[in-house]
């Protein structure tokens, strides 16, 4: 769950909320299940309506519900990050929420917490991102051309074109056809397009594919 743009641009992360809460569906789905509106967490609305933009307010709200993550993998991960990365061993609560935020925010503004420096500091050998079949992988190309020693490779995830109930399925199919220069009006043309894109991903360093199958359908 990393964005290749981070490592291509190598810019400071904006703030704790938009790094650790807003983009993480494991976090906001838990809060949503307990009645927290997604707009209060800064999640964009489909209708373009207003959402919370103050990262401190988002973080404060997160701290009020942090107890929900006790005993979960997400909670264990957060506790580890707070203690080992930012040096805060106490439990996050609404009372110390501001202190947590300030500590993380200050750290994110230092060179040590630039995306590439984090990879180097933790001796991460390889990061594999998850990318749609129609991705141009432009950010991966920037990383490869940058001279940086870190390794960030794509993973081929064709759900957007293989899942016919995906809301953007037809748009994605058209985009796939444009990328390979073929009108995808037959199943064989579709399979050939996937093979072409998979080969492109392999040439960009991909070593795996990722498929989300929500409901397996029997043959009979």
Stretches with model-predicted labels:
Residues 2-220:
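Metal-cofactor-binding active-site regions of metalloenzymes
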